[in-house]
Amino acid sequence: MQRSPLEKASVVSKLFFSWTRPILRKGYRQRLELSDIYQIPSADSADNLSEKLEREWDRELASKKNPKLINALRRCFFWRFMFYGILLYLGEVTKAVQPLLLGRIIASYDPDNKEERSIAIYLGIGLCLLFIVRTLLLHPAIFGLHHIGMQMRIAMFSLIYKKTLKLSSRVLDKISIGQLVSLLSNNLNKFDEGLALAHFVWIVPLQVALLMGLIWELLQASAFCGLGFLIVLALFQAGLGRMMMKYRDQRAGKINERLVITSEMIENIQSVKAYCWEEAMEKMIENLRQTELKLTRKAAYVRYFNSSAFFFSGFFVVFLSVLPYALIKGIVLRKIFTTISFCIVLRMAVTRQFPWAVQTWYDSLGAINKIQDFLQKQEYKTLEYNLTTTEVVMENVTAFWEEGFGELFEKAKQNNSNRKTSNDDDSLFFSNFSLLGTPVLKDINFKIERGQLLAVAGSTGAGKTSLLMMIMGELEPSEGKIKHSGRISFCSQFSWIMPGTIKENIIFGVSYDEYRYRSVINACQLEEDISKFAEKDNIVLGEGGITLSGGQRARISLARAVYKDADLYLLDSPFGYLDVLTEKEIFESCVCKLMANKTRILVTSKMEHLKKADKILILHEGSSYFYGTFSELQNLRPDFSSKLMGYDSFDQFSAERRNSILTETLRRFSLEGDAPVSWTETKKQSFKQTGEFGEKRKNSILNPINSIRKFSIVQKTPLQMNGIEEDSDEPLERRLSLVPDSEQGEVILPRISVISTGPTLQARRRQSVLNLMTHSVNQGQSIHRKTAASTRKVSLAPQANLTELDIYSRRLSQETGLEISEEINEEDLKECFFDDMESIPAVTTWNTYLRYITVHKSLIFVLIWCLVIFLAEVAASLVVLWFLGNTPPQDKGNSTYSRNNSYAVIITRTSSYYVFYIYVGVADTLLAMGFFRGLPLVHTLITVSKILHHKMLHSVLQAPMSTLNTLKAGGILNRFSKDIAILDDLLPLTIFDFIQLLLIVIGAIAVVAVLQPYIFVATVPVIVAFIMLRAYFLQTSQQLKQLESEGRSPIFTHLVTSLKGLWTLRAFGRQPYFETLFHKALNLHTANWFLYLSTLRWFQMRIEMIFVIFFIAVTFISILTTGEGEGTVGIILTLAMNIMSTLQWAVNSSIDVDSLMRSVSRVFKFIDMPTEEGKPTRSTKPYKNGQLSKVMVIENSHVKKDDIWPSGGQMTVKDLTAKYTEGGNPILENISFSISPGQRVGLLGRTGSGKSTLLSAFLRLLNTEGEIQIDGVSWDSITLQQWRKAFGVIPQKVFIFSGTFRKNLDPYEQWSDQEIWKVADEVGLRSVIEQFPGKLDFVLVDGGCVLSHGHKQLMCLARSVLSKAKILLLDEPSAHLDPVTYQIIRRTLKQAFADCTVILCEHRIEAMLECQQFLVIEENKVRQYDSIQKLLNERSLFRQAISPSDRVKLFPHRNSSKCKSQPQIAALKEETEEEVQDTRL
C-alpha cells in the first residue's frame, strides 16, 4: 500500500478533498489494485481505536452496576460528533435564509419598488455567497460524521471479536453464528452512514421553527396550512411504512423458504445431479418464488406511493399555503416565489430528514443495547493449574453442559399437550423425553503419570470429547477436582485449517524450529503429500483447505498439536479420515515413538490402540464403565463390545437415540432469539412443527452453513436479507451496507469439494457456535503464493548425534509471540482470504441495459408510456406560458404552471382568478397522470426480475460440475439472495426515481429556455460538465466499491474461522495472534472504505461547485437582461435553484442505477453459463417414460425384450480418463475394467487416491474421456439424465432438503404411500418416521437436524431402493455411523440389492470383506483388479491393511488345523460424534 497524500495535504486540499485526485486519475485510466490504495491514518487503525474504547468500557464496567456502552462511546467520540453537528446546522441554516434574498431580488423588479433595483446585483452576490458558504460547511461536516461513524464501527468490531474469543462454551452454544455476524454487520452498519443523519433530530425542529417564523412574516396564519399538510403527509408516509413492514415480515418468511431450499440445492448440487432431481428442485423453488412475488408486488406498490407522495406533494404545499392568504388579502408575486422556496426546504426537513433521523437513533440505540448485552455475557474461565505437577488426575468429576433441562422439558411437554393438533401421535413425539437434566459426565476418576498414554473409548455420545473439554477448561465441572500442569496441546476431532500456508498451520504462531518441524512432518506422514505441491509447505490454503483430502487435513491438524511443546496432549479421534495403513503408520511413528515421553490422552475405539495404551478409560452414557489396563479389560469386562455398542439391544438403542435426538431438537428450537433466553421464557418458543417450515424461519434467511458461508444484506432496502434479527429495520436509503458478499463483497466459505473425503456439516438454521466448532467444513480455495512464509528461525544447527526423539523433546523457546505486525502484511492476508475476482467491468455496459430492457417486451411500451405523459405535461406548461404571454397587460397576473417538477409556480394578482382555476384544473389532471405513470413501470420491472430468476435457476441446475466447481457456493447464493433482492426491491424504485428526476430536469430546462434563451445557453455546458464528471468519477468509484467489498470478506471469514477453531485457539493460547490478524483485516477494509468516502465527497463537492457557478451565471444573466418582469425573474431563479438541486439528485441516482445494474450483469453472467450435455452425442431416438426407445433396444442386443434398461447391471469401463476442468490435469487415467451383473466391487487406495472421484466419473459429473457401457449400452448413446438414472447413489455427503419425509424420499411423487412405507420398513426407517407427528408429512428443516447421521444415511439408502437401480454406488456409507445403523445398511444391501451390481468405497475392512473383486487405485491409475484371494497372496496394499484376525474370519478353514486362535474382541467403532445430540459435541 502507498503512503496517503492526506498526510502532507494542505488545509485547502483537505477542505476540498483535492488530495484524492491521484487515485481518481489512476482509476480512470487503469484498473485499480490493492497496492494502489493508500495506507490509513494511524488514528483510524483498529489497534488504537479498540484500545481506546476498551479502556473506556473497562472503566464503565468497573465503576457501575449497570454499565452503559453509550457512555463509553460518548467519552471517546462526543466532542468531535457535536462539532460536526454544529457545522451541519450552520449549513442547513443557510438553506433557510436563501429564499429571503430571492424574495428581495424579485421585489426589486416590482414597478412600485424601483429604489431597490440598484441593489439587486448585491443581493445576487449575497445569494451566491450563501451557496458557497453552504458548500464549505456541509461537505466537511458530512464527511466528518461519516468518519466518526467508521471509527465507532471499527472500535466495536474489535471489541466484539475480542469478547467472542473469551465467551464460555455454554454461552456459545446459545448464540447462533448468525447472531454474531449480525452484530458485526447490520447492527454496526448503522453507524457508518447513519451518524450523518443523527443530528437532524435536533436540527429539524430548530429549522422548522425558523422557517415558520419567516413564512409567518409573509403569509401570517395561512402558513400553517402548508405545514399541517406536510405533517399529515409525514403521518401518511409513516402509515405506509407500517404497511410496508407488514408485507416485509410476511415476505421475509417466503424469501427464507426459497433461499433455504436454494442454498441446500447449491450446497448439494452434486447429489441433486446424481439423483436427477433438477426438475423437481426447480419446480419446488419456482412455486415458492410465485408466492413470494405476490407479496413483493404489494410491498413495491406501497413503497412506490410512499416515494411518489414526496415528489407530488410540492404543488399542494405551496397551493395550501398561498391560497387562503390570496383569497383573503390578495397576494403579491414576491411572496409566492419566496413561499415556494421556503416550502421546498420545509418539505425536505419534515418528510425526509426528520423521519430518517428518528429511525437512525432508534436503530443505533437498539444496536448499542444489543452489543452491550453481548459484551456482558459470561466469559470462559481457565482452570487453576499446578505448573509443578507432572500427572493428570481427575477425582469424582461430574459435569453438565447446561443446568435446568428438567424445567425446560416439563414446560415444553405441557405446552405441547395444550396445543390443539389434528394429529394423535404428538404424545409419541414427547414420550421419550427425560425430565431431568442428565450430566454429560458423572463420577469420573482416573490418574495417569507423566509419559503415559490414556486411551478413552466409548459409544457415540458417551462423553469422550466432553472429557477433553473439561481438561481444557471449556466445560466446568460441577463436582470433583481436576489437576494437571496446564501446558496443553489439542488436536480436534474435526480438523481445523486456518487460511494460510501449510507451514503456518503447523507452526501456528509458535517459534520455528527447523529440525523439530521436519521430525513432526515425517511422523505425521505429510512429507509425500507436501512434495506434490509446487510450493511445498508454502502453498496457501484457503478456508478449510478445500484442495486437501480429509486425511491430509487430519494429519496437518495432528502435526500442529504435536509440534507444540506441551506437557499434556489431547488427541480427539485424530484418525477418523485416514486409511487403515496410514493410520497404523502414524500411530506407531508419532503417538508411540515421537511422543513417547509425553503424557497423551487419545480418544479412540480401535483395538490396536487400546492394546498399546498404558491405561484405558471406557465411558458409557457419561459414566466410567471401565478404567485400567487392556489385560484387566479382557478379564473383567469380556462383554464390553456388545454392551457399549448395542449389538444385542437394537430396539432399546434406537429408542435412546431417538430420545436424545428429539431432546436436542426441543432444546435447539427453544433457544432461539437474539437475547439470552431464560428458562421461564422457553415455553413461548417451544418446539413446534407445522406443515410449513416457513414459520420457524422468520428471522433467518440462510440456513446455518450459509450463515457460516455467507451473510448478505441488501442495499437500500428495509428488507433484511441476512435475516438474523426480526426487529432490525434498515433505513430505506442506505447507500452501502457492511455485509460480506462477493462483488458487493461476499464472505464465503466455498462449497465443499464434490470429491472431498472429509467431514461435512449438515445445515442447521440456528446452528450454535459450539456446534460450529465441532464440525469442519471442507471448504476453501487454493491460492499459490510465490513468496515463502515469513517465519523466524530460533534454533541453531542441531547438536551432533541427536536422535529425532531428542530433537522433538527439546523444549521450544518460550518466546512464542511472533512479531506479527512486521511479518504479516496486507498482501499476505489478502491472499489467505482469497476471493473470486469478478470479471465484470467497472461500469455497467450499454449491452447490459439493452438486454435488461428487452427481457420483457412490455417494458419498452411502458417506457414509451412514461415519455408520452411527460411530453403532455411539458406541453401543458408551455401552453399556459404562451397563454399568459398573449394576455393583455391589464389582465396579467394569471397563472403559470410548470408541471415539470412537483414545484408548482404561481403568478397571480388579486384582480383576477379565472386563470388560477384553469391552472388548478390542468394541474390536477396532470398530477393524476403523473402519479400513476410509475405503477406500470414498477410492475413490469418486477416481472423482469421474475423472468431473470427463472432463467438463472434453470441455468445453475443445468450447468456442468466443472463450471460449478470454479464458483463458490456463497457467490452462487448471493445471486439468488442479494442480487435477486436488488432486482425485486431496489432497482424498480431507483429506476423510477431516476426517470422521474431526469424528466423533471428536462421539463424545467424547457420552461426556462422558453422564458430566457440566454440561460439555456448556460445550461448546456453545465449538463455536459455533469456528465463528464460522472463518467470520470464512476470509473474509480465502482472499482473502490469493489475493493471495499472484497475487503469485507477477510473480516467475516476470519470471525468464522476463529469460531470454528476456538477450542484449538484457546488450547494453544493464540488469541492475541488472531486478534492481530483480525485488526489487519479491519485495517485493510478501512483503507478502502475511507478512500471511497473521500472520493465520494470529492465528487459531491465538485457537483456543488458546478451548481454554484451555474447559479451565479443564471442570477446575473437574469438580473442584467430582464426588464420590468418580476414574474420572469421569479420563475427563472426559482427554477434554477430547483433544476440544480434536482440535477444533483439525478446524477447521484444515475450512479445508484449503474451500481445496481451490476447485479443484473452478474445475473446475466450466470444465465450465460454453459449447460450440461443434455443430448446423446450419437444420433438416437428419445426415450419415453423411463424406457429406451424400440430403436435403442434393437441396436443394443444386450437389453432384454421387456424394454427395461438396465436389466442386469453389467458394466464395462474402457480407457476412462477424468479431469475436474477442461484442459486440466487428469485425476484418473486410462481406467479399464469390467464388472459382471450382481457383482460387488470394493475400491481400495490411500486417502486422496481418487476413489470418490471414480464414482463421480461414473455419473459423468466430471470431464471424462473414454467409454462406459451398461448392459451393452454406451454412455454416448443416451441422454445424461437417463444414464444417471441407471445408478443408485449413497453419497459421502448426505443430502436432506427442507421438506416432508415423503418429498425427501420421492420428490417426483411417483410412488404411493404403501410403497414408501414398505421401503422404509426394509431400511429400518419406519420406527423413526412414526415417532414424528404427521409421519410421512412431517417437515424436516435445516438439513434434517432432528435425524441422526445414521438415519440420514438410511434415507439415502431408501431413495436408492425406491429408484430400483441396478447399479449401486456407495461412497463411504459407514462414515460416522453407529454400529446399529451400520448393521441395518449391511443387511439392506444383502436383501434389497441382492441382485444388483454394487461398487463400494469404504475404509472399514469388515465391509470390504463382503466384496468379490477389488479395484486398487494408485497414482491415478488402476494398480490391481483381482479377487480377494489373489490380493492376499501378493504383497498388496490390501494385504498390508488387513489384520490377521480379519484373515481368520475370511478363511477359517486355512487355520483350523493350526493352533486354536485366541478369542478376539470386536473392534470398537471409530466414531466422530458428528451427530451426537444429547451432549452437543
Curated annotation (Swiss-Prot):
- The residues exposed to the Extracellular compartment are 99-122, 217-222, 320-339, 880-918, 1012-1013, 1117-1130
- The EC number(s) attached to this protein equal 5.6.1.6
Residues annotated to bind ATP 1? 401, 434, 458-465, 493
Query: Which parts of the sequence are annotated with region: Disordered?
Result: 1462-1481
Lipidation feature positions (S-palmitoyl cysteine): 524, 1396
PTM comment text: N-glycosylated.
What subcellular locations does the record give?
Apical cell membrane; Early endosome membrane; Cell membrane; Recycling endosome membrane
Among InterPro entries, the record links this protein to: AAA+_ATPase (IPR003593), ABC1_TM_dom (IPR011527), ABC1_TM_sf (IPR036640), ABC_transporter-like_ATP-bd (IPR003439), ABC_transporter-like_CS (IPR017871), ABC_transporter_C-like (IPR050173), CFTR/ABCC7 (IPR009147), CFTR1_ATP-bd_dom1 (IPR047082)
Question: Which of UniProt's keywords are assigned here?
Answer: ATP-binding, Cell membrane, Chloride, Chloride channel, Endoplasmic reticulum, Endosome, Glycoprotein, Ion channel, Ion transport, Isomerase, Isopeptide bond, Lipoprotein, Membrane, Nucleotide-binding, Nucleus, Palmitate, Phosphoprotein, Repeat, Transmembrane, Transmembrane helix, Transport, Ubl conjugation
Example GO biological process term?
cellular response to cAMP
Q: Which residues cross the membrane?
A: 78-98, 123-146, 196-216, 223-243, 299-319, 340-358, 859-879, 919-939, 991-1011, 1014-1034, 1096-1116, 1131-1151
Residues with attached carbohydrate: 894, 900
Residues bearing PTM Phosphothreonine: 717
Instruction: Cite the GO molecular-function annotations of the record.
Output: ABC-type transporter activity; ATP binding; ATP hydrolysis activity; bicarbonate transmembrane transporter activity; chloride channel activity; chloride channel inhibitor activity; chloride transmembrane transporter activity; intracellularly ATP-gated chloride channel activity
Q: How does it assemble?
A: Monomer; does not require oligomerization for channel activity. May form oligomers in the membrane. Interacts with SLC26A3, SLC26A6 and NHERF1. Interacts with SHANK2. Interacts with MYO6. Interacts (via C-terminus) with GOPC (via PDZ domain); this promotes CFTR internalization and thereby decreases channel activity. Interacts with SLC4A7 through NHERF1. Found in a complex with MYO5B and RAB11A. Interacts with ANO1. Interacts with SLC26A8. Interacts with AHCYL1; the interaction increases CFTR activity. Interacts with CSE1L.
Protein name in the entry: Cystic fibrosis transmembrane conductance regulator
What is the species of this protein? Answer: Papio anubis
Q: Which gene encodes it?
A: CFTR
